[in-house]
């Protein structure tokens, strides 16, 4: 019998996410219908300060944590007759250890790579905004840190449940990374992670 660890079969996750776009709101998964039209004309992506990025990510992302950032960008939304407001954050961070970048990008030094530590968009943005936002964040990253030639991003197909066994996070299979021409490099080491 498994206690608070319940693993979803990757195909179950893929079937679910084929019809929905996963987002986070107050650390809980929510979903936008896949295929809804995204209007980029009312959005912009800009570099943002650490404090603003951290406050957004910690309040929205399921983990409630913030990585060691090297670069941060925000997605801003502007409604008619309203002030522009933050609706998403991408955090490009220091990888967990010095071996990550050379492992996935042979020939690069650790400083020539970066990890996409967090990408969190609020449910205010229509589905499919992720790939649009990520492309613009990557352009800004290239200007801010021209030495960076590789980005590592992880997807996590395993569900997370709280101490009561309630679903906190469905897994995801990296659809936005595929849409951004990322190359799948396989699984990282298996581990057990208990969330309090």
Functional labels for PLM-detected ranges:
Residues 26-68:
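Short amphipathic alpha-helix that is part of the acyltransferase structural core
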Residues 62-63, 80, 121:
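Short beta-turn/strand-loop junction motif enriched in small, turn-promoting residues
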Residues 68-70, 189:
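A short, compositionally biased
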Residues 57, 70-94:
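Conserved beta-hairpin
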Residues 1-7, 114, 130:
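Eukaryotic non-globular interaction segments with acidic/serine-rich, low-complexity composition
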Residues 40-43, 70, 87, 111:
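Sequence-level motif detector for i,i+2 pairs with an aromatic at +2
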Residues 44-47, 93-196:
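Acyl-donor binding region in acyl/amide transferases
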Residues 2-34, 38:
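Charged, low-complexity intrinsically disordered segments and flexible loops
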């Amino acid at each position: 019998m498994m206690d608070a660890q319940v693993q979803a079969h990757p195909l179950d996750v893929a079937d679910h996410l084929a019809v929905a776009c996963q987002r986070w709101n107050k650390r809980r998964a929510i979903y936008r219908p896949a295929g809804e039209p995204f209007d980029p004309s009312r959005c912009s992506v800009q570099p943002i300060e650490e404090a603003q990025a951290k406050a957004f990510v910690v309040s929205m992302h399921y983990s409630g944590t913030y990585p060691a950032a090297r670069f941060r960008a925000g997605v801003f939304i502007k409604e008619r007759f309203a002030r522009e407001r933050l609706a998403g954050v991408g955090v490009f961070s220091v990888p967990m250890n010095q071996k990550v970048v050379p492992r996935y990008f042979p020939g690069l030094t650790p400083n020539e790579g970066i990890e996409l530590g967090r990408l969190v968009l609020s449910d205010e943005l229509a589905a499919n905004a992720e790939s649009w936002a990520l492309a613009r964040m990557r352009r800004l990253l290239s200007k801010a840190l021209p030495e960076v030639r590789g980005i590592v991003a992880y997807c996590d197909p395993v569900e997370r449940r709280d101490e009561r066994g309630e679903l906190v996070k469905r897994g995801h299979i990296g659809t936005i990374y595929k849409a951004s021409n990322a190359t799948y490099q396989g699984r990282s080491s298996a581990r057990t992670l208990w969330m309090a």
